[in-house]
């Protein structure tokens, strides 16, 4: 089966845009959420519609519940019902236990965990049949915890748990799975040199191809016997076992 009525958060750029391209085509309807990337969202909409999809743009700040409600209302008015939700939008800022503040904590939890939970709840009320999917884009770091990016890591660990528990709650009508990417696209804080150093430190010593993440989304949608699973696509980053004391290095 294929998803035909799709909502993607953070769908205008990076991994979200790649997933939108993968899932679009004739007889497909997509609601693409964006926050600040209006021009990129509009350009992507034109490209996807050129190849036969119907695309609706939904602007919103996922840290605000009223914006989430607006996105759902727009999606319901345009799509009538849903069969696929991709919770991709994410906030990724650095803090530590020693210096985090309420603003950082609440924003990470709101965008990375609360918003997917609310969207999951509303999605479950607007489906038909037994072949519906939710895909959560998480992070490989949930499998190998560190004290860095404290609020982000806690929020993504919560999204991992949401994936498992909602798979239990929403079966058999909705399958819920997750993808935990590794180094795929350089973030704004990284130099090319730092990003290369990051992916060369993985066991497979390679950058993750975003198309592999898109293929995994498509695989989960078409696999009717899989739910509650989280797949690491990370060049083995979550398997890294070497530490300075083991290697005898400073």
Positions of PLM-derived features:
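Conserved NAD(P)H cofactor-binding loop of Rossmann-fold oxidoreductase domains
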Residues: 88-93, 236
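Conserved glycine-rich cofactor-binding loop
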Residues: 12-14
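Catalytic loop of short-chain dehydrogenase/reductase
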Residues: 133-171, 183, 237
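Substrate-binding pocket helix/loop in short-chain dehydrogenase/reductase
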Residues: 96-97, 104-109, 198
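Conserved glycine-rich Rossmann-like NAD(P)H-binding loop of the short-chain dehydrogenase/reductase
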Residues: 28-42
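Short C-terminal tail/terminal secondary-structure segment
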Residues: 144, 227-250
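C-terminal substrate-recognition "lid" of short-chain dehydrogenase/reductases
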Residues: 209-233, 238
């Amino acid at each position: 089966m294929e998803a035909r009525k799709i909502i993607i958060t953070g769908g205008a750029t990076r991994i979200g845009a790649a997933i939108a391209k993968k899932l679009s085509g004739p007889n497909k309807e997509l609601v693409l959420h964006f926050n600040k990337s209006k021009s990129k969202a509009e350009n992507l909409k034109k490209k996807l519609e050129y190849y036969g999809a119907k695309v609706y743009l939904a602007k919103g700040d996922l840290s605000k519940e009223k914006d989430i409600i607006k996105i759902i209302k727009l999606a319901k008015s345009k799509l009538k019902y849903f069969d696929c939700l991709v919770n991709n939008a994410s906030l990724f800022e650095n803090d530590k236990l020693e210096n985090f503040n309420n603003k950082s904590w609440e924003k990470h939890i709101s965008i990375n965990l609360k918003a997917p939970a609310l969207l999951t709840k509303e999605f479950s009320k607007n489906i038909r049949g037994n072949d519906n999917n939710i895909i959560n884009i998480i992070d490989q770091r949930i499998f190998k915890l560190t004290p860095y990016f404290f609020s982000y890591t806690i929020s993504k660990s919560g999204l991992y748990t949401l994936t498992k528990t909602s798979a239990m709650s929403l079966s058999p009508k909705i399958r819920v799975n997750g993808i935990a990417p590794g180094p795929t696209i350089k973030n704004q804080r990284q130099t090319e040199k730092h990003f290369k150093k990051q992916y060369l430190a993985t066991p497979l010593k390679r950058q993750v191809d975003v198309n592999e993440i898109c293929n995994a989304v498509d695989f989960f949608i078409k696999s009717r016997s899989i739910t509650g699973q989280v797949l690491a696509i990370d060049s083995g980053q979550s398997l890294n076992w070497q530490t300075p004391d083991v290697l005898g290095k400073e």
